[in-house]
Amino acid sequence: MSRYRGPRFKKIRRLGVLPGLTSKRPRSRSDLQTQLRFGKRSQYRIRLEEKQKLRFHYGLTERQLLKYVHIAGKAKGSTGQVLLQLLEMRLDNILFRLGMASTIPGARQLVNHRHILVNGRIVDIPSYRCKPLDIITTKDKERSKALIQNYLVSSPRGELPNHLTIDSLQYKGFVNQIIDSKWIGLKINELLVVEYYSRQT
């Protein structure tokens, strides 16, 4: 299944706020209105929607997300927590969380177009897994710096998660540590995502 490129507002109307996909927010709707519009949700549908939230927020294909679930399942600790950590430490997401891109798709474009360096080397793989002590910078070219500056100025600045630091003047971000679960950038029940995939096998 390919990466979603359709109307973004349609997705947030169904799934709720997805800051990685778009900065737009759906109009508030009561739980009763939602239930009347979409009908009573089955347990399967609830699990499916949580999985879709994760997929669309981080901009993944179904195959990519399944791969991350398998990796998380083999790691020590809670599969759901490890899954979220893996997704949060992707380079495209780190750029987004630093405010160097307004959305994760925007961050992915910066990486694909070779504007981004990690530890002084160009990295053009959005899924690159960042590690503690990584230093993320832009190419020393006017166009690259202009793109990042535009994002830093125009992006709404939320509270920076404690595993990251940004030096806006130097167009430089620092990864201090692995992300703590309370700083995950999406309201999600990751256990339902794990359950969804465990029931598919």
Swiss-Prot record:
Record keywords: Chloroplast, Plastid, Ribonucleoprotein, Ribosomal protein, RNA-binding, rRNA-binding
Record protein name field: Small ribosomal subunit protein uS4c
Family: Belongs to the universal ribosomal protein uS4 family.
Gene3D superfamilies named among the record's database cross-references: Ribosomal Protein S4 Delta 41, Chain A, domain 1 (1.10.1050.10), RNA-binding S4 domain (3.10.290.10)
Residue span(s) of domain S4 RNA-binding: 89-150
The keyword 4Fe-4S belongs to this UniProt entry's keyword annotation: no
GO molecular function annotations of the record: rRNA binding; structural constituent of ribosome
GO biological process: ribosomal small subunit biogenesis; translation
SUPFAM superfamilies found in the cross-reference section: Alpha-L RNA-binding motif
Subcellular location: Plastid, Chloroplast
Coiled coil: none
N-terminal signal peptide: none
InterPro entries found in the cross-reference section: Ribosomal_uS4 (IPR022801), Ribosomal_uS4_bac-type (IPR005709), Ribosomal_uS4_CS (IPR018079), Ribosomal_uS4_N (IPR001912), S4_RNA-bd (IPR002942), S4_RNA-bd_sf (IPR036986)
SMART domains: Ribosomal_S4, S4
Cellular component, GO annotation: chloroplast; small ribosomal subunit
Function recorded in the entry: One of the primary rRNA binding proteins, it binds directly to 16S rRNA where it nucleates assembly of the body of the 30S subunit.
Description of how the protein assembles with itself and partners: Part of the 30S ribosomal subunit. Contacts protein S5. The interaction surface between S4 and S5 is involved in control of translational fidelity.
